[in-house]
């Protein structure tokens, strides 16, 4: 009996390790915009939250540091002139609008806008983790142990997808909070819908066309051309619409849950202070 248990634990551990590499990499890509939001939109009050985000980002990055370095070198080697022109032009337009809107006061720097473009480019990687459920289906078909599937694989995937999508929710919520502090509260909901729409397009292009975020740098012309061509086709268009509906619905649901938890914690803290 003990030998069987040890063998099962060893088998379960191997099943966990089988998904470790791609899960940690996808989770790093999902958490990266959240980490960027700490710099772009201001530090959160909770020190534990700040350290938690940084720790999770570092923990998911370290196993893939060499891969990330190779990707960075690839981008630098094959970066397109058209992308540089497009990025500089877009950044200049955004900075000009920012200075005009704020009359030069508290306007953001070039570095900030470049960071914001990276934030938007990588943000679709967070809800993208929901599509990794196809790997769970493959694992269920591969393994014949109901206990392994129920006790190990399903919890592993739920934690992975939950962390990734919650990173998306918190990143977008921080963007909304930032807009509110700048006096642009009326733009929060439209911005959320726009980001969800861009994320839906990014998810489709990533899952079906196998593009990734750095393809926007190395082959922007091809990405734009194929995206426009696909959106003009019926099947890709409706797949994108359904994806948009799913991630938008889940986002607002999880936003409500997150805000409710935050309000409950504030009420509890105020109650404790009033009793002292």
Give the residues covered by each predicted segment.
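Hydrophobic transmembrane alpha-helical segments in integral membrane proteins
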Residues: 5-30, 75-84
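Membrane-interface transmembrane-helix boundary segments in multi-pass integral membrane proteins
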Residues: 15-24, 151-153, 212, 222-249
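Central hydrophobic cores of alpha-helical transmembrane segments in multi-pass inner-membrane proteins
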Residues: 26-42, 54-64, 83-100, 173
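Transmembrane alpha-helical segments in integral membrane proteins
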Residues: 31-42, 95-99, 162-179, 244-266
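Membrane-interface helix-boundary motifs at transmembrane edges
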Residues: 40-51, 99-111, 177-186
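A generic, lipid-embedded transmembrane alpha helix
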Residues: 57-69, 116-133
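Hydrophobic alpha-helical membrane-insertion segments
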Residues: 113-124, 191-209
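Juxtamembrane non-transmembrane "cap" segments at the membrane-aqueous interface
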Residues: 201-223
């Amino acid at each position: 009996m003990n030998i069987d248990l040890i063998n099962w634990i060893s088998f379960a551990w191997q099943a966990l390790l089988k998904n470790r590499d791609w899960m940690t990499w996808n989770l790093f890509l999902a958490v990266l915009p959240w980490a960027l939001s700490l710099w772009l939109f201001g530090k959160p009050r909770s020190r534990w939250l700040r350290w938690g985000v940084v720790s999770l980002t570092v923990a998911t990055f370290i196993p893939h540091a060499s891969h990330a370095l190779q990707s960075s070198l690839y981008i630098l080697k094959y970066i397109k002139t058209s992308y540089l022109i497009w990025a500089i032009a877009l950044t200049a337009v955004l900075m000009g609008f920012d200075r005009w809107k704020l009359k030069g006061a508290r306007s953001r720097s070039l570095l900030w806008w470049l960071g914001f473009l990276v934030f938007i480019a990588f943000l679709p990687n967070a809800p993208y983790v929901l599509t990794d459920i196809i790997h769970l289906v493959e694992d269920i078909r591969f393994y014949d142990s109901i206990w392994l599937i129920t006790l190990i694989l399903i919890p592993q995937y739920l934690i992975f997808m939950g962390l990734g999508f919650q990173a998306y929710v918190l990143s977008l919520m921080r963007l909304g909070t930032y807009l509110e502090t700048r006096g642009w509260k009326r733009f929060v909901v439209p911005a959320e819908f726009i980001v969800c729409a861009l994320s839906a397009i990014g998810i489709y292009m990533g899952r079906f066309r196998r593009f990734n975020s750095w393809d926007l740098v190395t082959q922007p012309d091809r990405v734009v051309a194929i995206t426009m061509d696909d959106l003009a086709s019926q099947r890709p268009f409706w797949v994108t619409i359904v994806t948009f509906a799913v991630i938008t619905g889940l986002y607002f649901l999880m936003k409500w849950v997150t805000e409710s938890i935050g309000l409950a914690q504030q009420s509890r803290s105020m109650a404790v202070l009033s009793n002292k």
